[in-house]
């Protein structure tokens, strides 16, 4: 049961405007909510400052759908009881989640940022972010399983994100082992997960799963070096769904897959575009080339080098051709 919070005047006005078919006058809102018309006007101004688009006319106010990250909408949409924090900007939602542990915040906790400054991917590589055109989020989770029985969180998450995008957009995304999601041969999502262990008991305390999703960054806005490598779900900048919808769908799928862990590995294998392909990878500064032939039940990539087969549990692989 989710804890019911008292709505502020601002939240009540927003809910009322969203539900209304027609223009609502300041007088009507004031009477319904039992506040002054000045209070209504001030609350409307605050909502606009936050980025909500509200049309003004002689007859009153009308809500225009806009893509604002809305903690309340996300909280209500996710079937699990997850605390939601929405930030205007963050240096790293992964670091925010680590800080939340230090601050004694309860889990599961989802931190979503409208913009990520100096975002980093795996191997500490920078990636491109844009305000109100991406989704940058991390989930803090306390696993119930023992260390040996843990699901492959990165793989499970990749399936949840990929399937959510496919369903909402009617597209066919693919996964590059281990944690990147591609659309039309270009990267749209990167996923990271890390574990926090209790040093004294050597037990797992928390898992943090983070991701960056290129949502509606116009293709021409990507730097030259990323033009051939990265794209957005809506490269023309015109989104047909909201970020809130995608966030809700992703986490509902994630929690469903987590509850029934029998299906995600097969789904991941089906969506992998590296199986059967020639790949290169580095080990101890030496480059190897082989064919990716399987993904094991523990998420390792099996590569046939000809004279032997090797299992990769992490690291970067390159494909001769993504096509």
Segments (PLM) and residue ranges:
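Residue-level signal for inorganic ion chemistry
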Residues: 40, 93, 137, 180, ...
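Short loop/turn motifs enriched for small/polar and acidic residues
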Residues: 59, 178, 184
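Long, positively charged amphipathic alpha-helical accessory segments at protein N-termini or as interdomain linkers
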Residues: 3-35, 49, 146-147, 155-173, ...
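A short coil-to-beta-strand element that immediately follows conserved catalytic motifs
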Residues: 109, 172-176
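Short, ordered beta-strand-loop transition motifs
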Residues: 55-58, 176, 295-296
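N-terminal lobe of the biotin/lipoate ligase/transferase fold
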Residues: 6-158, 166, 241
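Glycine-rich beta-strand-to-loop/alpha-helix junction loops that act as flexible
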Residues: 114, 178, 209-213
């Amino acid at each position: 049961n989710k804890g019911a919070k008292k709505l502020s005047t601002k939240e009540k006005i927003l809910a009322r405007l969203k539900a209304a078919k027609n223009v609502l006058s300041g007088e009507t809102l004031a009477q319904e909510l039992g506040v002054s018309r000045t209070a209504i006007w001030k609350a409307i101004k605050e909502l606009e400052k936050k980025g909500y688009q509200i049309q003004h006319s002689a007859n009153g106010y009308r809500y225009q759908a806009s893509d604002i990250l809305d903690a309340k909408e996300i909280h209500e949409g996710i079937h699990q009881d997850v605390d939601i924090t929405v930030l205007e900007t963050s240096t790293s939602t992964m670091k925010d989640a680590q800080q939340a542990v230090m601050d004694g915040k309860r889990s599961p906790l989802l931190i979503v940022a409208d913009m990520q400054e100096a975002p980093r991917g795996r191997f500490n590589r920078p990636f491109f972010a844009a305000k109100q055109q991406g989704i940058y989020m991390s989930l803090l989770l306390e696993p119930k399983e023992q260390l040996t029985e843990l699901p492959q969180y990165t793989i499970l998450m990749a399936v949840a994100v990929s399937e959510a995008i496919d369903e909402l957009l009617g597209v066919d995304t693919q996964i590059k082992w281990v944690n990147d999601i591609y659309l039309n041969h270009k990267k749209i999502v990167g996923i990271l997960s890390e574990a926090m262990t209790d040093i004294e008991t050597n037990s797992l305390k928390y898992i943090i799963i983070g991701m960056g999703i290129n949502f509606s960054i116009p293709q021409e806005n990507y730097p030259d070096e990323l033009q051939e490598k990265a794209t957005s779900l809506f490269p023309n900048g015109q989104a047909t769904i909201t970020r809130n919808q995608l966030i809700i769908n992703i986490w509902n799928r994630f929690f469903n897959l987590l509850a029934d862990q029998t299906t995600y590995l097969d789904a991941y294998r089906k969506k992998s575009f590296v199986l059967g392909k020639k790949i290169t990878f580095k080990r101890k500064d030496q480059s190897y080339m082989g064919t990716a032939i399987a993904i094991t039940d523990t998420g390792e990539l099996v590569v046939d080098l000809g004279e032997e087969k090797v299992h990769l549990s992490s690291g970067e692989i390159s494909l001769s051709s993504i096509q």
